[in-house]
């Protein structure tokens, strides 16, 4: 199964960071022109993935403005849930990205309204885990509102390590128009950030989805039960422990529904 997953994710065992940056910027430019959209929108958390995707987006629109004389724009959106504990990291990311526009929308009131509506309708309280997914979906809703208003595309940060584990919210951070980090694993993303001269604090920041109130700042690796180094090694075709391989492959099968459009009677992938 390892070779099948490597083929699906498109991860290369070795990359040229400079060349990968060029190719991914070119992809953003070509698709933006193809669609006729006026720019790009991306949520910025202060983590590795959005920092990298954000910088690629800004480079892409700057190059397009120079090449086409059209006013393409990039909107970087801060989407905190109330007061974000690592706000300084988010500000550091914005300083690195240098976006055309930096917007801020606090999603806490909208999430609270959604929770209240659910409780009123059902008489039940949504679990903390499900509330975390509601936060992710509210963030994406806001990004699509902004994109619709300005005639832009929404950029996602999904990469190979997230894809194989399904470590994203369906119709939340998994919903977007284009994913410039596809085909990269976690350590390769770091390589691109170093090539772009990102602050070391952004590159080495402990990854966290930070969605659960009861477990704030829960590290991804703790939630996954495996390390990104193990996942990256697997995706590069290396041997990892039998236990970790079995866990990763079982997880890949379990989250298969996230890799497809809504299932229909004509589909057979799930059988």
Swiss-Prot record:
Pathway listed: Cofactor biosynthesis; NAD(+) biosynthesis; NAD(+) from deamido-NAD(+) (ammonia route): step 1/1
EC identifiers of the protein: 6.3.1.5
Alphabetized UniProt keyword annotations: ATP-binding, Ligase, Magnesium, Metal-binding, NAD, Nucleotide-binding
Keyword Protein biosynthesis: no
Residue sites binding ATP per the record: 43-50, 157, 186, 208
GO biological process: NAD biosynthetic process
Gene3D superfamilies the record matches: HUPs (3.40.50.620)
Reaction it catalyzes: deamido-NAD(+) + NH4(+) + ATP = AMP + diphosphate + NAD(+) + H(+)
Name recorded for this polypeptide: NH(3)-dependent NAD(+) synthetase
Species per Swiss-Prot/TrEMBL record: Exiguobacterium sibiricum (strain DSM 17290 / CCUG 55495 / CIP 109462 / JCM 13490 / 255-15)
Gene: nadE
């Amino acid at each position: 199964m390892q070779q099948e997953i490597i083929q699906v994710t498109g991860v290369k065992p070795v990359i040229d960071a400079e060349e990968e940056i060029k190719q991914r910027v070119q992809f953003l430019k070509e698709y933006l022109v193809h669609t006729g959209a006026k720019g790009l929108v991306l949520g910025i958390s202060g983590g590795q993935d959005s920092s990298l995707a954000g910088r690629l987006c800004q480079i892409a629109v700057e190059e397009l403005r120079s090449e086409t004389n059209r006013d393409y724009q990039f909107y970087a959106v801060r989407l905190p849930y109330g007061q974000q504990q690592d706000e300084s990291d988010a500000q550091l990311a914005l300083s690195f990205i240098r976006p055309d526009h930096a917007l801020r929308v606090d999603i806490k009131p909208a999430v609270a309204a959604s929770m209240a509506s659910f409780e009123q309708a059902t008489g039940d309280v949504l679990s903390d885990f499900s509330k975390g997914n509601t936060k992710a979906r509210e963030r994406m809703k806001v990004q699509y509102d902004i994109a619709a208003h300005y005639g832009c595309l929404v950029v996602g940060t999904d990469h190979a390590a997230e894809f194989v584990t399904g470590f994203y919210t369906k119709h939340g951070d998994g919903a977007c128009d284009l994913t410039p980090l596809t085909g990269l694993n976690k350590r390769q993303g770091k390589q691109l950030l170093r090539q772009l001269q990102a602050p070391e604090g952004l590159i080495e920041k402990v990854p966290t989805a930070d969605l659960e109130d009861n477990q704030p700042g829960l590290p991804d690796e703790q939630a996954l039960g495996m390390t990104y180094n193990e996942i990256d090694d697997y995706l590069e075709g290396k041997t990892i422990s039998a236990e970790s391989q079995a866990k990763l492959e079982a997880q890949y099968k379990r989250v298969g529904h996230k890799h497809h459009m809504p299932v229909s009677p004509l589909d057979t992938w799930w059988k």
